[in-house]
C-alpha cells in the first residue's frame, strides 16, 4: 500500500489540475479522430498532438507504432506509447485508452457542436469526452502529478494510446500485439473500456457474441388469395417464437455475469413488402446472441439449424442463415489476478466502494489482450453516455479516476 503522506500529496495535486484536465479534454475534442471507414481521417493529428504533450510533460521513450492503412490520408493509423520510469523496470503498469471516436450522428440532436466541447453543471460535453478521453486524461494527469510531487513509483508506468478501437482494433492494439513485443506477462494492464456509474465493476470476462441474419423465402401472392403463396413473414414469426426455446435448451447460469445467462434475442427487422395487400415472399430479421463461455457456440449454431429445418418443413419455406459477427469468448482474467486486486484497493480508497470482478455481455478491447495471454482488466467510473448525442464526462469522475490510477502507481 502507498505511504499515506505521499498519497495525500498526490491527491491534492490531482485536484489542483482540474482546470488543466478540462482544458486538455476540450483541445482533444477539437481534433476529430474518426476512422476512415466511418468517413474520417483517422487519428494521426490527435496522436501527434498527444505525442508533443507527453514529451512536454516528462514522459520518455515516446513513440508511434504505425499500422499501415491506405484509406488514411497519411497511409497509417498511429498507436502511441510512452513511459514514466519507476524504481524498477521489472514490471510496467499500463493504462491503455483509445484515441479514435465515433461520428457524432444526427447533428440536430446535439445541444452544441460535438467537436467544440463545452462545460455545463460539472460536465464536459462533446464527442469522445467520455469514450475514451475521460480516462485518457485521467491517466496522463495521474502521472503528471507524480512528476510534479517528485514521487518515484515503484515500477515503470506505461501509457498506450491506440487507434481503431471503434472499428475492430485491427489497426490498433491488434496490430501492436502482433508486430511488437511491448507487453509482458507480469505487467498490470488496465483498459478503461467498460465500467458503471458507481465505479464498482471490474470487467474480467465476456460472453461469446453471435449475430445472425435470417432470410426466410416463401412465395409472394395477393393478400386475398394467401393459398396461392407461402407467407414468409408468418413462417419467420413462428421461427422467432421457436428460437425462444434456446433459453430452455441452454439454461446454464454463471453468477460472474449480469445477466447470468446466455441471451438469444431477435433484434433488427427489415421491411418486406411495401403494401398491406401482398403476401410477402421474402422476410429478413436478425438475432443477437450473447453466449456464456461454457456454452459451445458451434453447438448453438447446430441447434438453430435444427429449429430452422423444422420451420422449413412445416411452412414449405427456405431459411438462409448468415453470420454477421461471431466472436468467441476470450479466456477470462482471474478475479484473483494482481491487476484486479490493485483496482479493488484503489477503488476502495478513492471512492469508498467495494468493486468486484464481473463479466459482461458486450465485447471490449481487453479481450484482445486476453486472447494473447495477458490478464487485462477493464475499469472506469462512467455515466455510460458513449456514442450518444450530447455525450458527456462528469468532471469529478475524471478527477477520481486519476486518483485511482495514482493509487495503483504507488502500490507495491
Question: How should these model regions be labeled?
Answer:
Residues 1-9, 16, 33, 71, ...:
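Metal-dependent amide/peptide-bond hydrolase catalytic core
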Residues 2-125, 148-153:
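Acidic/His- and Gly-rich active-site-bordering loop/insert found
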Residues 63, 94, 158-160, 320:
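A structural signal for isolated positions on well-ordered beta-strands in alpha/beta enzyme cores
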Residues 77, 112, 154, 185, ...:
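Short, solvent-exposed loop/turn segments at the edges of secondary structure
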Residues 91-94, 123, 158, 187-189, ...:
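Structural motif
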Residues 96-98, 160-162, 190-193, 217, ...:
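Short beta-strand segments
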Residues 122-137, 222:
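Glycine/serine-rich anion-binding loops at beta->alpha junctions
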Residues 130-205:
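Acidic/histidine-rich catalytic neighborhood of metal-dependent amide-processing enzymes
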Amino acid at each position: 500500500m502507498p505511504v499515506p503522506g505521499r498519497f495525500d500529496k498526490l491527491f491534492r495535486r490531482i485536484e489542483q489540475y482540474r482546470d488543466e484536465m478540462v482544458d486538455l479534454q476540450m483541445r482533444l475534442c477539437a481534433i476529430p479522430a474518426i476512422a476512415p471507414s466511418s468517413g474520417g481521417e483517422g487519428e494521426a493529428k490527435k496522436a501527434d498532438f498527444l505525442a508533443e504533450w507527453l514529451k512536454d510533460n516528462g514522459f520518455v521513450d515516446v513513440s508511434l507504432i504505425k499500422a499501415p492503412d491506405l484509406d488514411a490520408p497519411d497511409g497509417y493509423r498511429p498507436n502511441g506509447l510512452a513511459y514514466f520510469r519507476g524504481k524498477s523496470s521489472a514490471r510496467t503498469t499500463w493504462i491503455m485508452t483509445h484515441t479514435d471516436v465515433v461520428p457524432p450522428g444526427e447533428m440536430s440532436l446535439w445541444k452544441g457542436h460535438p467537436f467544440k466541447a463545452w462545460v455545463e453543471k460539472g460536465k464536459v460535453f462533446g464527442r469522445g469526452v467520455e469514450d475514451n478521453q475521460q480516462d485518457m486524461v485521467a491517466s496522463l494527469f495521474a502521472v503528471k502529478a507524480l512528476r510534479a510531487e517528485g514521487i518515484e513509483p515503484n515500477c515503470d508506468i506505461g501509457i498506450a494510446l491506440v487507434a481503431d478501437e471503434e472499428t475492430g482494433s485491427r489497426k490498433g492494439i491488434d496490430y501492436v500485439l502482433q508486430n511488437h513485443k511491448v507487453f509482458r506477462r507480469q505487467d498490470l494492464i488496465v483498459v478503461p473500456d467498460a465500467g458503471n456509474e458507481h465505479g464498482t465493476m471490474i470487467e474480467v470476462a465476456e460472453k461469446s457474441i453471435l449475430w445472425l441474419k435470417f432470410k426466410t423465402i416463401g412465395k409472394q401472392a395477393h393478400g386475398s388469395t394467401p393459398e396461392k403463396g407461402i407467407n414468409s413473414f408468418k413462417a419467420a414469426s413462428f421461427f422467432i417464437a421457436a428460437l425462444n426455446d434456446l433459453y430452455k435448451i441452454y439454461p446454464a447460469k454463471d453468477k460472474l455475469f449480469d445477466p447470468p445467462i446466455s441471451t438469444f434475442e431477435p433484434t433488427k427487422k427489415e421491411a418486406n413488402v411495401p403494401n398491406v395487400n401482398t403476401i410477402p415472399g421474402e422476410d429478413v430479421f436478425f438475432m443477437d446472441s450473447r453466449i456464456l463461455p461454457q456454452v459451445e457456440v458451434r453447438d448453438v449454431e447446430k441447434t438453430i439449424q435444427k429449429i430452422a429445418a423444422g420451420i422449413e418443413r412445416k411452412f414449405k419455406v427456405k431459411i438462409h442463415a448468415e453470420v454477421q459477427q461471431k466472436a468467441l469468448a476470450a479466456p477470462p482474467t482471474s478475479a484473483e489476478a494482481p491487476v484486479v486486486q490493485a483496482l479493488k484497493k484503489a477503488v476502495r480508497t478513492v471512492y469508498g466502494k467495494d468493486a468486484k470482478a464481473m463479466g459482461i455481455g458486450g465485447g471490449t478491447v481487453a479481450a484482445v489482450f486476453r486472447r494473447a495471454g495477458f490478464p487485462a482488466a477493464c475499469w472506469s467510473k462512467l455515466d455510460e453516455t458513449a456514442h450518444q448525442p450530447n455525450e458527456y464526462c462528469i468532471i469529478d469522475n475524471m478527477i477520481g479516476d486519476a486518483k485511482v490510477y495514482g493509487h495503483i502507481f504507488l502500490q507495491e
